Structure formats: C-alpha cells, structure tokens
Amino acid sequence: MYQKDLYDLQIDLVFKCNDFSNLSNHFINKSDNIIFESGFWEEVLLCWIKIILDEKDTSFPNFILYKKSFSLSLQIINDNEISSINQKWMNKSGSTDVLSFPIISDEDTTKDLNFIELGDLFISLETAFKQSLEFNHSIKKEMLWLASHGLLHLLGWEHNDDYELDNMLNFQEYLISKLD
C-alpha cells in the first residue's frame, strides 16, 4: 500500500454494509471478505486522498488540496436499494453499480480550512459481483474500482466526454495500483 507519510490527514467514514452473508459465504473468496470491514475502507480512502493531495491534480477544485480532514459515507447495498436511490435522486430507472452524491462546491472555500464533508457513496454489491465475473477479476478489485470512481466524483471530478472519462479511468487504475 502507498507508504508515504499520511501526516495529519484524517478521515471520518460513516460505513454501512447490508447483511450479505449468504452471498459472501457462497460466492466470495474468504480473502475478499475484507470489503465488508470499515477499517479496510478507511485505510484505502485515506491512502487515495493522500495520493490525490500529493499529485495536486488539476481535475480537483484547488481548495481540496489544502484540507486535512475528510468526511464521507460509504454504503454497500443491494440492487433494489440502489435502484430506488437511482430513481429518486437521479430520475433514472434500474440499478447501477455506484452512485455518488457530492456535497462540495466552490462555496466550500469559505468553510473551515482543514475539514470538508465530501458526500455520500453507494455501491451495489450485487452489481459489483456480476461485473467482477464479467471482467474476470475479484470482487475486491471491482469494489475498489467502483469506490475509486465514486470518490473521484465526490472530490469534484466529472467526465463529460470520452477524453475526460479516459483520464478518470486511468487515474482510477493508478490509485488502485498504489494499494499493492
């Protein structure tokens, strides 16, 4: 995992995971069960935020680069729940793999200089599992892929065209590679 000094960075993670014991007992390797643990996600998200701050990437609002404490929620839910959220908040029918609801805006520059509330991130474990089979990799890797995508959106990264999407996907690969 990315070993640079995390200096004074802190993350306040509100983590919720539905009971997927029937799925995890039958379809998920025991080594991948770490995706159900809050501590795993705290470490991963803090690592990624540190990398982003070190990179000083211009795809993020400048005020992000000077924060020391980040707060967000991550919820691992099922297809029915994400479909309901997708319909209610995005006005789209059907399930999806990840939804992010950023809170940040340019006005955040006037708030506490060290703390920022990023928003809410929802990942459908059922869709992630299907995609892990489709792409022939572990559920852990798929969950990392989806979490990195959602985090980048929470930090203000958008993909309005293929070029921006390619840049975002490449940066996701970079973030995930730093966890090895």
Swiss-Prot record:
The keyword Translocase does not apply. Its EC number is 3.1.-.-. InterPro entries: MetalPrtase_cat_dom_sf_prd (IPR023091), YbeY (IPR002036), YbeY_CS (IPR020549). It is found in: Cytoplasm. Keywords: Cytoplasm, Endonuclease, Hydrolase, Metal-binding, Nuclease, Ribosome biogenesis, rRNA processing, Zinc. One of its GO terms (molecular function) is RNA endonuclease activity. Zn(2+) binds at residues 149, 153, 159. Its main location: cytoplasm. It is an enzyme of class 3 (hydrolase). Binds 1 zinc ion. GO terms for biological process: rRNA processing. The keyword Protein transport does not apply. GO terms for cellular component: cytoplasm. Its cofactor is Zn(2+). Single strand-specific metallo-endoribonuclease involved in late-stage 70S ribosome quality control and in maturation of the 3' terminus of the 16S rRNA. HAMAP family: Endoribonucl_YbeY. Belongs to the endoribonuclease YbeY family. PANTHER family: ENDORIBONUCLEASE YBEY, CHLOROPLASTIC. This is Endoribonuclease YbeY. It comes from Prochlorococcus marinus subsp. pastoris (strain CCMP1986 / NIES-2087 / MED4). The gene is ybeY.
